[in-house]
Amino acid sequence: MNQPGGAAAPQADGASAAGRKSTASRERLKRSQKSTKVEGPEPVPAEASLSAEQGTMTEVKVKTELPDDYIQEVIWQGEAKEEKKAVSKDGTSDVPAEICVVIGGVRNQQTLDGKAPEGSPHGGSVRSRYSGTWIFDQALRYASGSYECGICGKKYKYYNCFQTHVRAHRDTEATSGEGASQSNNFRYTCDICGKKYKYYSCFQEHRDLHAVDVFSVEGAPENRADPFDQGVVATDEVKEEPPEPFQKIGPKTGNYTCEFCGKQYKYYTPYQEHVALHAPISTAPGWEPPDDPDTGSECSHPEVSPSPRFVAAKTQTNQSGKKAPASVVRCATLLHRTPPATQTQTFRTPNSGSPASKATAAESAFSRRVEGKAQNHFEETNSSSQNSSEPYTCGACGIQFQFYNNLLEHMQSHAADNENNIASNQSRSPPAVVEEKWKPQAQRNSANNTTTSGLTPNSMIPEKERQNIAERLLRVMCADLGALSVVSGKEFLKLAQTLVDSGARYGAFSVTEILGNFNTLALKHLPRMYNQVKVKVTCALGSNACLGIGVTCHSQSVGPDSCYILTAYQAEGNHIKSYVLGVKGADIRDSGDLVHHWVQNVLSEFVMSEIRTVYVTDCRVSTSAFSKAGMCLRCSACALNSVVQSVLSKRTLQARSMHEVIELLNVCEDLAGSTGLAKETFGSLEETSPPPCWNSVTDSLLLVHERYEQICEFYSRAKKMNLIQSLNKHLLSNLAAILTPVKQAVIELSNESQPTLQLVLPTYVRLEKLFTAKANDAGTVSKLCHLFLEALKENFKVHPAHKVAMILDPQQKLRPVPPYQHEEIIGKVCELINEVKESWAEEADFEPAAKKPRSAAVENPAAQEDDRLGKNEVYDYLQEPLFQATPDLFQYWSCVTQKHTKLAKLAFWLLAVPAVGARSGCVNMCEQALLIKRRRLLSPEDMNKLMFLKSNML
């Protein structure tokens, strides 16, 4: 029992002796460090270092860490931490020393300058003993709960942050080199803004700020350089280069016109990025960097593909035609993606142990770190400004978005579009290869073998062909949405199998095994095609941002269900182009605010919220919610329909004791809805059908009046004259005389091929005169006309936009309205011009916000002069003679744009806004959408995308 105790006592003595020995050795090391600072470093024998280490390693715990990117090694010595620990009476420390050794990195680098630390007593033995581990004694000073850098004095609370800072010091020394001048503290100069930095970590953070601004899209592969290579210019390199002429920092302005599509851009960068869309990015196999003696040796891996996320724009020196410095033109391999495994083995196997291969691995890790950091900085910069008024601009087409998520979806659409363009440019496989594939199946047919040997595996069909098949399937679905269930049916599969069998000369393969379920295949590629069409619609709407758009939100009912259809209109050339942006199932509980929020969310995916927008809604949607976002007009067909319904409703007629009118309407409905009448007996009243929001009761009354003779002949042969005898022909004629102009006005206002907004005010004036003239008659017709006048003033509201649009018609101008309203309408035109003139100004958007208050007083006379010129332009236009023939309005304003600039811009915006929100195709679209909803064939999101493709692709 005494043996363990006796053994423990000598062990304690040994530990105390070892502690005293380690303390004495630590004091000798400190004295030797002080002496080396004065006398210089002296070599220490290896034996002495080994003996000293054996004394100090008695009670030392060693921790090892392995970083992800194999950074250079750092040994942590907690000297400051040990000083705060409790010390026993005999001078020994209670807690042993703790050393953290980071293993890994390049073997040829031990310290920041490639040498042993100056204060290290080990000298050259450190390099020999650790063989690839460098000791940085003064890098860490742990005091008061923080990590302090021994080089620059910065303090960090967390170890990871401090490790990143030490890594930046490593990069600093690696970049500056051994021969760099230590006297020059500010060694890193930014060639973009000229700022200088002492430490590489600070310069790296500053360099990331320029990363978002210099990224753009270039069409040619040789223009894709590393943006960070353009930002890093060493001081010695700047001194050796000749001075360059001063160039203004900022975007280049001018008038740039695309030679492919004719779009114009004021700034060179959006124009350059737009031209790149016509020539998609592709990696040419024969591309090589320019032959430059200074840079040819640095580009050692031409097969590494450049990262598509970071493509640098041309520098100003390259644009001016001068030779760029060597630091700018060198091969940009830091941001290139790591090549595939096969390529990596190809050029790394011969020199697997060479420093070049290890440097390539370090550069690839550094590229991933820098690329991720720049991307995170880009996302944080955009996400931090969500509440600001600054828009998010697409670098490819220049379109602005209010929300950052919409910009990301738009950029993905560009990526999908470019990918498909690249795939379409690739050459197809030769026919000989296809014939070889079918040869085994030809033997099968001739020998009557089994079909198992001739089946083609799923991988034999290229992805491009599968995309083409999916596109055709989606086109079939868009042509008739009722074919969703037919596509997966047996008959359709048999038809597809027959087509494949007939097209193959030497056999066939199973369509079901190769393509699988057709619905699944089509819906798999639905988001890709949706993004392709969406980016085209976004570009089309964004190109007309300076003119404004018109947006209609109209509900269409089919039985008990209804849905909202959102459509955007704009002038493209001499025509009005419409785009269906979204379809949403309507609910009785949906208020005007809910519909307004849905409209704004959909519009934010295509256009900016600041764009000038005129909304056209139906009677179910409250105009107060939309008035906050822009001008809100009511559908003219819905307004006239409300006028007719309010007068001819049974409650109103009963209150006015007009029982004969009620009886007449009931008889007309019975005659028009009789099953014994053939279709040819009741033909259509007009070749152009009215919009779907028109009243059906009025149509039945007008139909009976027009086909009265045919109806009487039909019922006389059928010996059913009781219905004809109960029909009041005189009252029918008077009602037809009132309702026919109303329906004719609705048909004119619903014209889809010509502008219609300028016809609203003349229609109101014409109907008002008609009802006033008929009101002087006696009897029931007079009462009805008084009711029509009251309903017209209450339901058919005339907006100032209607008055301005009427003036913009050179055939009408102010002729339809009385003279006492001329000055009021001219004032409305001038007000509307003043409201939108700020967006027409070319330099207003780029004036700093701080300068606007100081220049407000100076711009007052200029604004007054501008108002006077705008008013004179309106009067000059009104003094011109009226057109006798009906002109093409867009063609007319295209010809007089130089003469009447402000009015022309106003005309291209307002005349594209329709007067009627509902269209003839809305009924069919709503029926198909509701059919999909009832049968649950698709999810609401997929249904919306499919309706979008149906409207904008076919």
Curated annotation (Swiss-Prot):
GO cellular component, one term: nucleus
Basic and acidic residues biased stretches: 366-380
Positions bearing N-acetylmethionine: M1
ZnF C2H2-type: positions: 147-169, 188-210, 256-278, 392-414
An annotated GO BP: regulation of transcription by RNA polymerase II
Biased composition, class Polar residues, residue ranges: 340-357, 442-459
Subunit structure, interactors included: Interacts with UHRF2.
PANTHER family: ZINC FINGER PROTEIN (PTHR24383), ZINC FINGER PROTEIN 618 (PTHR24383:SF12)
Family: Belongs to the krueppel C2H2-type zinc-finger protein family.
Protein name in UniProt: Zinc finger protein 618
Source organism per UniProt: Homo sapiens
